[in-house]
Amino acid sequence: MAQDPIFQNLEQVHTYGSPLGSRAKSLSEAMKGFRLGTSGPKTLQPNLERNGYTFFVRPQLNLSAKNCLRVRQLFRLLTDKVNSIPTFCRTTLDPRLYITPSENCRTSLIDNDNPFIPILTNCCVSVSGWPDLTTPSWTSSEGMRREAYSIVDGVMENYEAFDLDVSFFNMQDEPISQLFYTWEKYATLVFEGKCHPYPDFIAFNEIDYNTRIYRLVMDKTDTYVSKIACCGIAYPISLPSGDYANFRQDTPLEAKKDITIRFRCLGAVYYDDIALQEFNETVRQFNERLDTEVSEGMLGSKSSSFYQVPVEHRQAFSFLLPYIDINTLELKWYADLSKPENKVAYDYLNKLKESEYYKPMQGVLADVQPKIINQTGAREVLV
């Protein structure tokens, strides 16, 4: 009498005890050949991804005192209160002010080593308007029997101008509205000739109010970058300013929850690994010590001044810097241990690990291993 098979796990049940076949190998089997009657969505797992992150690169405006004194609308930026919203807007949009003692802009509201604008990433609600890639084609005119032929006639890359609508959570005191007003007002003042960019931007004929928007789509564990997209350059072109002046007697107290800013973008980059490299280069340009450690291969080592924060400890640290591992596509978050807040958290976690109460992270995120990614950044299919 044949003995009933004993299955050790659920995967063996699907593989040997079910006509649907293996769930783990369903992708490779769908690629390899036809499975009549048993293939399709029943065994193939859906593509699960997280929304990920939206990063906005800081522009390089010239908001020095000399420029601000040229126009009365910028007078409000020249406050002696370092930790105020006007100083935050001024230093965020002009990183050079932070290291200029005479400008009195060493505010604790920003991390000047961060190339991105954290408040926009943290408060981003939605981004819409990215164009699709298309293949241009040309079709001949019809012949006597209405026959025609068609060929590819163009490039697939998108270098066109398009608009992105980005919605942000509108918090108390409206720092985002003030930030974009300063940004857009400065751009128009440069056009009028009332404000002047920094001399190096004039010498190299560069535009200083441009930014770049990065979209990072993450895997279901929020560990690896599944897709990356970015525009060539972008700059804001709208500011919802008329709505706050409207009036209705039946709504004396109304919450302005979201604010939508339109960006004019030039070019869209998809499925191009150069976006990964440019993302990292942006981070390195704003942080000389990080750039040095990457060049010398020290980043992530024991002698590094940057600590790679694991997933379960990210909320314990401040001023984290994102950096993409080109080989594995892992989005790593580094804490600068030269900052007192991060050093305190780092020392506390080390003491916690030595105690008997410390338990390593368990669950789905603990099972994520870099070995599933090869050196080209492509996920290996289980066969």
Task: Map each language-model feature to its residues.
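Glycine-rich, low-complexity intrinsically disordered segments
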Residues: 1-383
